[in-house]
Amino acid sequence: MKVLALRHSVAQVYADTQVYVHDDTKDSYENAFLISNLTTHNILYLNYSIKTLEILNKSGIAAIALQSLEELFTLIRCNFTYDYELDIIYLHDYSYYTNNEIRTDQHWITKTNIEEYLLPGWKLTYVGYNGSETRGHYNFSFKCQNAATDDDLIIEYIYSEALDFQNFMLKKIKERMTTSLPIARLSNRVFRDKLFPSLLKEHKNVVNVGPRNESMFTFLNYPTIKQFSNGAYLVKDTIKLKQERWLGKRISQFDIGQYKNMLNVLTAIYYYYNLYKSKPIIYMIGSAPSYWIYDVRHYSDFFFETWDPLDTPYSSIHHKELFFINDVKKLKDNSILYIDIRTDRGNADWKKWRKTVEEQTINNLDIAYEYLRTGKAKVCCVKMTAMDLELPISAKLLHHPTTEIRSEFYLLLDTWDLTNIRRFIPKGVLYSFINNIITENVFIQQPFKVKVLNDSYIVALYALSNDFNNRSEVIKLINNQKQSLITVRINNTFKDEPKVGFKNIYDWTFLPTDFDTKEAIITSYDGCLGLFGLSISLASKPTGNNHLFILSGTDKYYKLDQFANHTSISRRSHQIRFSESATSYSGYIFRDLSNNNFNLIGTNIENSVSGHVYNALIYYRYNYSFDLKRWIYLHSIDKVDIEGGKYYELAPIELIYACRSAKEFATLQDDLTVLRYSNEIENYINTVYSITYADDPNYFIGIQFRNIPYKYDVKIPHLTFGVLHISDNMVPDVIDILKIMKNELFKMDITTSYTYMLSDGIYVANVSGVLSTYFKIYNVFYKNQITFGQSRMFIPHITLSFNNMRTVRIETTKLQIKSIYLRKIKGDTVFDMVE
């Protein structure tokens, strides 16, 4: 959903669009709630309130004030992520395909021969980080840039088995135009760029679990963040490999040698960060022209010093000369050395060239060892070739994708490796490594042990659901880690599957009730965005690839009206209510009937079931940004800070009734997941509320009327307005509450319209108009620890006879209250009051 705010209406008609005019009779919160539950994708919000826009954005719903038709046309035709704190729109707009154009935010790609392999008549355009170079295209009242690029497709091609780039891109662009992409995939980089700076302002130690190549630029500015990944491939791991020969396989049609060099250096940088938590100087020997340096320096300020007879235009200092082992003394501490020396074969005889390459490999290794031998805080990445070698067993082997699989690989060394045991590795084993292993990640840090880190803030995005983690340990971590943002895959199945297949792995599935967190917010991706100054124009779809975002230790936990709130809670029910049942009251009708309340007169007004809880349960797949458990808990401890909106405090029994309705809904739908979720939420309600039932009552509150429009043969027909189980010394407390509630009780608009047989031999009249007051007085009794009400639903009625009688229907008739009293069952009236 996107909310586009306008001061005046527009003449154009847009598809999937609704107009909402600000209602001045309601406050900003109520207007925001009503907008959020509209069913179309685009909302044109007229006569808008700035406060309402703020509320929507904090809820993760993109809402922005527009000043021109051009702004409207741009935003209505695509999705976007909105930084509502800095007033920046990041478009996810692929309409540039209509210019026969693909886009990249990686400069090195523009220096390759990729355009030879594009679709006929197409071109490649560089747009800068997150589309920063496109800002000049939009002369708007807010900052705007198009963050959409095709880098994800280009990188996917590089790691795929496909060789024909044109066919690959054609297929992927067609998929992009027809298949639902997770919106989080498009906006994740914007999110990470907001998330980590804000965390580092508040927390000294930040730990990040499971970073992937998509984040390889994001963390360059944060050397102190400790990364956990899948670990490195070590020299000692080659013992598992069988010997092989040279394979010679082309990976990419266009030259990706620069990409390989960039990944090697980035791997070395993050390895250095892990050891020393600071930025290094970067020395590079060979690898000219290294256009990728532009990309790295565009993201973060690094000092590069390079040696190569060829130009390296983006280096800080370039020496247009060869580098020899005697030059190592020129290199400073606190640095990285990247050695990428290899002579081109040219027309040389193969055997002669092979001998040269092996000599250069030994020379490269000597330079690396000499560099690491003295000084401190050093890491070296050196180019190697498959040959018989003695190597430190703890050295890291790298084989990032390059244009062709031939005989090269890279060795990552630190000063400790220099002193470690060396092992003879045959050439055939190294060929086996080259032929079969691709380094898929620039982050090669050790795996995360799933345990609490008391002195750190843990970020684990899309990293802990894998079934190689122990599920109970993941739950234990989330329950006990005081400060964290952790995601787990939500259980979107209908058969309550404990794990689901995803790509080539299995993931555990979770529901919010699997966790027993303390002061944690459990929400969706869009709900989480709102907590960090972002909102998005499209909520996550229930694809099966959805995650719960669990934030522990946030200072926003008690801000119930601002973050992870109840906006959009009824949107799904509004979208489907006109399908088979063809009535806007279908949800109300089902909820009442499923709790054996058959009086449906005024069912949309007299609610006996919490609609919030009911919708949050049965449609949790469509809106889990609303943190239901937090909402229940804060109500149970009376710490709900209501900032606005139409607020009605629910009695705990109304929450229970909602769970029962949801369970019946789940049974009818054969939805085992909703069934379990509803049961567990009901158990949770019973845990946080101390609900007691007057199923064996000894007192009741009665209401006597001046007029009863039916025949009756009981002595005094009355409405039993609830039963109590109390000791005699609690009677004064009950009387005090009745006195406090007197005005509200006598103001009830009570009506009746028919009679019916409640059961065999019990003839009653229906009563409408009392439920809201009943639940209010229930809450007052509950807070005073007085047992009021039974476990079954309260069905208001007046007993007319203890004989079977014919039912009667009359015009709706108002009942005038004569008196309200408290009486002991099978005893005397102990209190009576009149208006």
From Swiss-Prot:
Residues 693-835 are annotated as: 2'-5'-phosphodiesterase activity. The active site is at H718 (for 2'-5'-phosphodiesterase activity), T720 (for 2'-5'-phosphodiesterase activity), H797 (for 2'-5'-phosphodiesterase activity), T799 (for 2'-5'-phosphodiesterase activity). Keywords: GTP-binding, Host-virus interaction, Hydrolase, Inhibition of host innate immune response by virus, Methyltransferase, mRNA capping, mRNA processing, Multifunctional enzyme, Nucleotide-binding, Nucleotidyltransferase, RNA-binding, S-adenosyl-L-methionine, Transferase, Viral immunoevasion, Virion. InterPro entries: NS2A-like, VP3_Rotav. It is found in: Virion. Residues 556-693 are annotated as: GTase/RTPase activity. One of its GO terms (biological process) is symbiont-mediated suppression of host innate immune response. One of its GO terms (cellular component) is viral nucleocapsid. Residues 171-245, 429-555 are annotated as: N7-methyltransferase activity. Its EC number is 3.1.4.-, 2.7.7.50, 2.1.1.56. GO terms for molecular function: GTP binding; mRNA 5'-cap (guanine-N7-)-methyltransferase activity; mRNA guanylyltransferase activity; phosphoric diester hydrolase activity; RNA binding. Residues 246-428 are annotated as: 2'-O-methyltransferase activity. It catalyses: a 5'-end diphospho-ribonucleoside in mRNA + GTP + H(+) = a 5'-end (5'-triphosphoguanosine)-ribonucleoside in mRNA + diphosphate; a 5'-end (5'-triphosphoguanosine)-ribonucleoside in mRNA + S-adenosyl-L-methionine = a 5'-end (N(7)-methyl 5'-triphosphoguanosine)-ribonucleoside in mRNA + S-adenosyl-L-homocysteine; 5'-triphosphoadenylyl-(2'->5')-adenylyl-(2'->5')-adenosine + 2 H2O = 2 AMP + ATP + 2 H(+). It comes from the Viruses. CDD domains: capping_2-OMTase_Rotavirus (cd20757). Interacts with VP1. Interacts with VP2. Multifunctional enzyme involved in mRNA capping. Catalyzes the formation of the 5' cap structure on the viral plus-strand transcripts. Specifically binds to GTP and displays guanylyltransferase and methyltransferase activities. Has affinity for ssRNA but not for dsRNA. Capping activity is non-specific and caps RNAs that initiate with either a G or an A residue. Together with VP1 polymerase, forms a VP1-VP3 complex positioned near the channels situated at each of the five-fold vertices of the core. Counteracts the host innate immune response thanks to its phosphodiesterase that degrades the 5'-triphosphorylated, 2'-5' linked adenylate oligomers produced by the host cell IFN-inducible 2',5'-oligoadenylate synthetase (OAS). The host RNaseL is therefore not activated. Belongs to the rotavirus VP3 family. Contains a bipartite N7-methyltransferase domain, a 2'-O-methyltransferase domain and a GTase/RTPase domain. The C-terminus contains a phosphodiesterase domain that degrades the 5'-triphosphorylated, 2'-5' linked adenylate oligomers produced by the host cell in response to IFN stimulation. This is Protein VP3.
